[in-house]
């Protein structure tokens, strides 16, 4: 993994108190061989996204014949990151967001998820607590389904039992045939893990459950397995591949201060799910990665990161999987102005790859669901699904 550029409060305070002295040392002793202070100052401003202030420090290391090789490599990487940021700012991509009428109301709607055939749109709606749902500081959250009617989607209705029965439910994924649904359920429990600082503290324990549609009804929610859902980890935001064999999700191993990473698990021959596997580099970093969305092409992964170079906060990225070795290529920032200085996440793409959907408050104080035409370079591969049943004619 790469070195972390986030600035913990203690480090910021320590650097702030020494900043003027370090700068003075560099001014007085420009040939001082130990470039520790120069690198620290560059990283300090880099972490604050003050790239114009950080750039001269990295350039100084690059130009110094006596600088250590590891410092030169690090400075060179930082300068490349700065150039990437400048390119993002100056080169905008096509983006005309349109509020999705029907599902969008005066309440908050977010975490959209399309069924792979685009017939249904699932999302979370936050409403006053006199409505059914999981209580949340005077509001409740409903898991809602909207049906496509011609070129529009309906306003949506709450999903029936076993959904919306009191727990927080959201962050779903659904199979190609619309008959297997994965959902995140959050329960507040005391922490009993190895992190002594958090032992006994209450935390939001997120787990992934599934339900199958049989005879027109959804079955009772079941855990995907105790090897994935544990009482000491946060496992959420599932995304199932088109063949139902790989499940991607977000995991926090240490709920108190741990990083978010994207994991996957593989379906076993007996139908169970294998142990979680961290996707590793180049997807995961020392920062946070979350909200994975594996498109139905099974090769294009969209996700959010606050560490890969971006516009600020959480940015949307996409990465293509190599079909031969099943490894992901380096992720690409989806671009400005889709990404902003705020947080972007909960991003999904239609089956044909032409439209993207996300939750945003850009139209006013309420979160609503928006869609836009996704530009060509960021689209997944074109795919075709055939609906129907195989019958033996003999």
Cite the ranges covered by each PLM segment.
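Short, conserved micro-motifs composed of acidic
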Residues: 30-36, 47, 51-53, 63-389, ...
